[in-house]
Swiss-Prot record:
InterPro entries: Alpha_tubulin (IPR002452), Tub_FtsZ_C (IPR008280), Tubulin (IPR000217), Tubulin/FtsZ-like_C (IPR037103), Tubulin/FtsZ_2-layer-sand-dom (IPR018316), Tubulin/FtsZ_GTPase_sf (IPR036525), Tubulin_C (IPR023123), Tubulin_CS (IPR017975). Pfam families: Tubulin (PF00091), Tubulin_C (PF03953). Tubulin is the major constituent of microtubules, a cylinder consisting of laterally associated linear protofilaments composed of alpha- and beta-tubulin heterodimers. Microtubules grow by the addition of GTP-tubulin dimers to the microtubule end, where a stabilizing cap forms. Below the cap, tubulin dimers are in GDP-bound state, owing to GTPase activity of alpha-tubulin. This is Tubulin alpha chain. The gene is TUB1. GO terms for cellular component: cytoplasm; microtubule. GO terms for biological process: microtubule-based process. The record marks Y449 as: Involved in polymerization. The lineage of its organism: Eukaryota, Fungi, Dikarya, Ascomycota, Pezizomycotina. It comes from Gibberella zeae (strain ATCC MYA-4620 / CBS 123657 / FGSC 9075 / NRRL 31084 / PH-1).
Amino acid sequence: MREVISINVGQAGCQIANSCWELYCLEHGIQPDGYLTEERKAQDPDQGFSTFFSETGNGKHVPRAIYCDLEPNVVDEVRTGAYRNLFHPEMMITGKEDASNNYARGHYTVGKELIDGVLDKIRRVADNCAGLQGFLVFHSFGGGTGSGFGALLMERLSVDYGKKSKLEFCVYPAPQTATSVVEPYNSILTTHTTLEHSDCSFMVDNEAIYDICRRNLGLERPNYENLNRLIAQVVSSITASLRFDGSLNVDLNEFQTNLVPYPRIHFPLVAYSPVISAAKAAHEANSVQEMTMSCFEPNNQMVKCDPRHGKYMATCLLYRGDVVPNDAHAAVATLKTKRTIQFVDWCPTGFKLGICYQAPENVPNGDLAKVSRAVCMLSNTTAIAEAWSSLSLKFDLMHSKRAFVHWYVGEGMEEGEFSEAREDLAALERDYEEVATDSMGDEELEAEY
């Protein structure tokens, strides 16, 4: 079986993971203590558990997950929470002092002490897998542990597991709302370090998800749990075809093959539909056509950028539940007639479909309604460069005055690393611009010779 190991780094990574595992357990019929519910026992025994769970001799299902944070508070909540008996206690690794929003502490000083222990635990989980497919790494770009320790971990995973897929789910700093002043520094430093080590990075930004929760779920003041449960639905959709049957299955390597035209351009934009509250669910038709169209509206996308200003290179549509291939193909045919959805000229077809027959689950008493079908769209678009440019601007404003730089240098970082990281990001923005420019000219020139 193709197993996937989840590694959750820092506060954001660990809290998103809590929502994800809560959802996986509901989907697979696993109780908070790790044992199957009675009705699930009566069904087909092999229900695709083994991708995310390993089964012990006495029938307990243990997540293939590792929690690591440089300070204990967030992981302690898992250790004492409703799912404390689900996770292996040794797979929760915490330090004594946090990274204080400082990339250099997470990557160099404090992180260095913890990394070998974490890799040792990863090795133990990996040895338990028959055919390890890859890693999902959850972390934020703005925090100290998420950015610094996350980057260190990606570097070390590349050394130890070079051939395995490494997919990241990153919480990207929102354009308007910031949790710390030095987010632009941390984000650009971690992007620079992980650019060559990550195969595919799915970015979500808090502001975009706040807006989706406010608009679609009618929550005036969404909290992190509301946001994380929405992100969990996306992660579940992306991994559903690894766990359940479907007519068009997609595995981790296929994501890269279909979404990443060049190694550096690996930041797909994520959208999910329908996000709908229980109160409104009964009044909506929620047809395949409607769902598919709504994924292309900027309002439903999980990073603040406008895809109408960019061009698409590739798009994956992952359907779940009561969807027949015919409807999906019809929806895509309609999309292709739309003038607003522009593809780069060197990739005219650009749509990859996945269908998984397992209907989406919802958390009891949660905000999301129970729906019979859903779609998650992953699209590689040049518009995501907008997100980078707004971040670069903030970085430049601070770095021109060398503000806060001494905190990083004091933790053993070279000051030159800032300029190096900034140049790398400028190169990434240029890469996106080049991809968007029409490439027909070169071919015509070649044809003349």
